[in-house]
Every structure is written in structure tokens, then in C-alpha cells.
């Protein structure tokens, strides 16, 4: 099934690249990038099945190692291929007598995209090797498994489809929202408002390449926690343990908020210094996007997790329905802000944030209804919020005092380190995390002993 779906998706991506980039997204220069990325669609489809198999067997090790291999190969190939193909593109322009041509940028971007495809292929190769090594054990376990009834492939496929399709649709709506936003934004700016094309491209490049890239880092942690929450909730649901389901839900939400709330405050306070640290602060718009939209980290983290919770309690269709409602509503808001309010890329950020807020509201209502769940407020939201506010004010004042003396990069790194320390100190001081929860962390017992010595717990 994964082979068929992956091959179909890969073919659609490759042969439809011109239509997607030129007609839908109004960025014909990215056609080559999308064609190079087509291989990754097939590879990821197969790799997802193998990762899911090992996770279902109760081990995350093959998945974790394959992800490390994938990212290492991705980084190496992206840098090398981008450099080589950029030079190749420049030579093509020179040979054609074109000055200030786009071939260098087009081929360089395609080289960078090649890293994604080959990184995924390297991760898949590792998983295939592990699967071949494990096959002997699997065959032995299958021979020992005496069952009274053998399920047919048709019934198994039917269950898989009924489980997979709602998850895919929910994820697809999330991803489609970005594509739709791009198409609508460029249509409004270029065709309706007749804005300068290079300016519009700069706006969108800052939004995707800087704002969304940095805000997606803590959101990715929420996605990982969401994926790990689903099996535990499913086991509790099958055993009929509603108290355990509510306990797992509360713990997962608290953990995500412990990460996402300080991340949002940190990006608000240090967004511009972080951009300077990465040498990305080349336009005054970028820092403003973080001032306006860093709160999206909180709402996207929570909405991603609540999607997983609803899937874990076998309410697969609800996240899909909620995502469609949020997509349509946020699109109407974005059109109003960009076209009527003339807010250009700021309108996109506000609508992007509204999408996640609405998802949180709709998913939260569904969880309350189907799980009889009542959210704890103090330790989940108030204490992380107060601790994050103190941390953000402290590091902002510190940065303002230091950056003219010791330089932007050193002062930013120092503030980032101190931000973690200050936040952790106040969370512990305000009893935002219990000793039992600390003990569940890696090296948790050592951490508890150390904190007891300084009387923080």
C-alpha cells in the first residue's frame, strides 16, 4: 500500500510540478526544486511504515537513529549540492550571455532540496537493514503465535484505511493551509493590489524561511509528544481506564506548555537578536513578525497535541472537521486583513495564528465532551506563563545592556543560556513541576538530589 501510494504521490509531484509552482503558487522558478523533491515523497511513504512498525513493537531506537542519519546526510548533501549546482547555474547564465540571471539561484535551491531526498533515502536504507536483521526473530515469533482465527488481508486493509485516512486528512489540511495561504497572498498582492513582485517574494521568503522555520522548532517537539501520546491513550481506552486517559492527557498538555510557552516569550524578547546571531536580520519586517506572531508557538503546539489526543481516544473524524472549519475561517480572515486592512504579510501571520487558536478551541471542546476532561490551569498555564514573562523581561534587559559592549552574538548566546536557567528556576520556585515528574526525566534522580541541596524542591 505504501509503495503504491508513495509512487503515485511521487509521480504526481514530479509531473505536476509545473502546474503546482506556476499556476497555483505563482513561483515558476521553484519547479525544478519540486521535481527533485518528488523522490522524497516515495521514500517517506515507505519509511513511515517501517518506523511505525518498530514503534508498534515498542522500540523508538530504529526511528531515532534513522532520523539522525537522515539529518546528517541531508545537511552534508544540501550544502555540497547547493554549492556545486549554484556554480553550475551561474556558468549556464554566463554561457548564454545573461547577466544577473536566475539559473544560479534555481539550481542552488534544487541542490539544497536534493539533500532532503537523499537524506530520507539514507534513513530508509538503514531501516531496511535493521528490518532484514530483525526478520529472523519476527519469523520465529510468528511461528509461535497460535491464533484461533486468521484475519484476511481485506479486513486488515479496511481497518488500516479507516484508521489512516482521518489522520492523513487532518495532517493534509494543516499542510494545505500553507500552500493555500501562499497562493491567495500572492494573488491578492500581485493581481489585485499590483504590488512589486520582488517585494512580495521577499515578504513570503521572510515569513516561510525565517518566521515559520524558527517557530516550528518548538512545535516539532509538540508533534513528537503528540505521536508518543497516541499509543498510551489507545491502550487506556481499550482497557476502559478513563482516569488514566485523563491523567495522560493532562500530563501531555502540561509538558507541551512547559516547552511552548517559554519558547513563545523567548522568541518575542530575543527574536531580533536570534536573527542577528543567524545573520538573517536583513530586513526590518522579520523582527516584527516575531513580535506579532510568536504566540503561534503556544497555539500550534497545543492544537497539534489535541489532534493526537482525539486520535488516541478514537475520535478520528473530529480533528479533520475542526481543521476544515479553521482553514476556511482563517482564509476569510486573511483575505480581509491583506486586502481590506492592507496588512500584507502581517495579515498572513495574524490569520496563521488564528487558525491554531480556533483549532485549540474546537479540539478543547471535543476533549471535554468525549473525555469528561477538565483542564488544570495553575501548573499548566499560569506558572509557565509567569516564569516565562519574568525570563523574557530579564533577558531582554540584559541584552539591551550587553550587546553594545560585548557584541550581538556573544550577548545573544549568553542570554539564551540564562533564559533557560531563569525559566527553570522560577518554575521550580513556584512549584510548577513535581518531584515525581522530575524523577521521570533522564537522570531525574540526580537532578532531584541536586535541587534538594539548593532547596528548590
Specify the residue positions occupied by each region the protein language model found.
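Membrane-interface helix-loop junctions in multi-pass transport and translocation proteins
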Residues: 61, 72-125, 130, 317, ...
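Interfacial segments at transmembrane-helix termini and the short loops linking adjacent helices
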Residues: 18-36, 250, 267-297
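Membrane-proximal transmembrane or re-entrant/amphipathic helices at the cytosolic face
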Residues: 397-457
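Membrane-interface junctions at transmembrane-helix termini in multi-pass inner-membrane proteins
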Residues: 45-67, 295-325
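Helix-loop junctions and terminal segments of transmembrane helices
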Residues: 219-239
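Interfacial transmembrane-helix starts/ends
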Residues: 1-4, 12, 157, 161, ...
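Alpha-helical transmembrane segments of polytopic membrane transporters and translocases
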Residues: 195, 199-222, 253-255
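Interhelical loop/hinge segments that connect adjacent transmembrane helices in multipass membrane
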Residues: 91-110, 128-171, 240-243, 369-384
Amino acid at each position: 500500500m505504501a509503495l503504491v501510494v508513495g509512487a503515485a504521490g511521487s509521480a504526481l509531484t514530479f509531473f505536476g510540478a509545473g502546474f503546482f509552482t506556476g499556476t497555483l503558487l505563482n513561483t515558476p522558478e521553484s519547479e525544478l526544486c519540486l521535481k527533485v523533491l518528488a523522490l522524497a515523497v516515495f521514500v517517506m511513504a515507505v519509511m513511515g511504515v517501517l518506523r511505525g512498525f518498530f514503534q508498534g513493537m515498542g522500540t523508538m531506537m530504529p526511528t531515532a537513529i534513522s532520523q539522525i542519519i537522515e539529518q546528517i546526510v541531508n545537511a552534508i548533501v544540501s550544502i555540497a549540492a547547493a554549492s556545486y549546482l549554484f556554480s553550475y547555474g551561474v556558468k549556464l547564465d554566463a554561457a548564454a550571455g545573461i547577466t544577473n540571471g536566475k539559473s544560479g539561484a534555481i539550481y542552488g535551491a534544487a541542490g539544497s532540496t536534493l539533500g532532503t531526498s537523499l537524506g530520507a533515502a539514507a534513513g530508509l536504507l538503514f531501516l531496511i537493514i535493521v528490518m532484514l536483521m530483525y526478520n529472523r526473530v519476527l519469523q520465529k515469533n510468528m511461528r509461535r503465535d497460535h491464533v484461533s482465527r486468521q484475519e484476511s488481508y481485506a479486513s486488515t486493509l479496511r481497518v488500516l484505511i479507516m484508521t489512516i485516512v482521518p489522520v492523513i486528512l487532518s495532517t493534509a489540511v494543516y499542510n494545505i493551509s500553507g500552500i493555500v495561504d501562499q497562493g491567495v497572498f500572492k494573488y491578492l498582492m500581485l493581481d489585485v493590489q499590483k504590488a512589486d513582485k520582488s517585494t512580495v517574494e521577499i515578504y513570503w521568503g521572510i515569513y516561510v524561511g525565517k518566521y515559520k522555520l524558527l517557530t516550528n522548532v518548538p512545535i516539532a517537539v509538540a508533534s513528537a509528544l503528540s505521536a508518543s501520546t497516541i499509543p498510551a491513550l489507545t491502550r487506556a481506552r481499550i482497557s476502559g481506564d478513563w482516569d488514566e486517559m485523563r491523567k495522560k492527557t493532562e500530563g501531555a498538555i502540561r509538558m507541551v506548555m512547559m516547552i511552548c510557552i517559554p519558547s513563545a516569550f523567548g522568541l518575542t524578547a530575543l527574536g531580533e537578536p536570534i536573527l542577528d546571531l543567524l545573520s538573517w536580520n536583513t530586513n526590518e519586517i522579520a523582527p516584527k513578525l516575531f513580535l506579532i506572531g510568536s504566540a503561534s508557538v503556544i497555539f500550534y503546539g497545543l492544537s497539534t497535541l489535541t489532534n493526537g489526543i482525539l486520535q488516541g481516544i478514537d475520535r478520528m473524524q473530529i480533528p479533520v472537521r475542526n481543521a476544515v472549519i479553521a482553514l476556511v475561517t482563517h482564509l476569510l480572515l486573511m483575505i480581509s486583513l491583506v486586502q481590506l486592512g492592507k496588512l500584507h504579510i502581517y495579515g498572513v501571520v495574524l490569520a496563521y495564528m488564528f487558525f491554531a487558536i480556533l483549532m485549540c478551541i474546537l479540539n478543547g471542546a471535543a476533549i471535554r465532551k468525549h473525555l469528561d476532561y477538565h483542564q488544570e490551569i495553575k501548573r499548566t498555564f499560569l506558572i509557565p506563563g509567569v516564569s516565562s514573562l519574568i525570563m523574557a523581561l530579564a533577558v531582554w534587559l540584559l541584552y539591551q545592556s550587553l550587546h553594545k559592549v560585548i557584541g550581538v552574538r556573544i550577548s545573544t548566546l549568553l542570554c539564551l543560556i540564562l533564559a533557560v536557567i531563569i525559566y527553570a528556576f522560577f518554575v521550580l520556585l513556584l512549584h510548577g513541576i513535581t518531584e515525581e515528574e522530575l524523577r521521570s526525566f533522564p537522570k531525574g534522580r540526580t537532578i532531584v538530589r541536586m535541587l534538594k541541596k539548593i532547596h528548590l524542591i
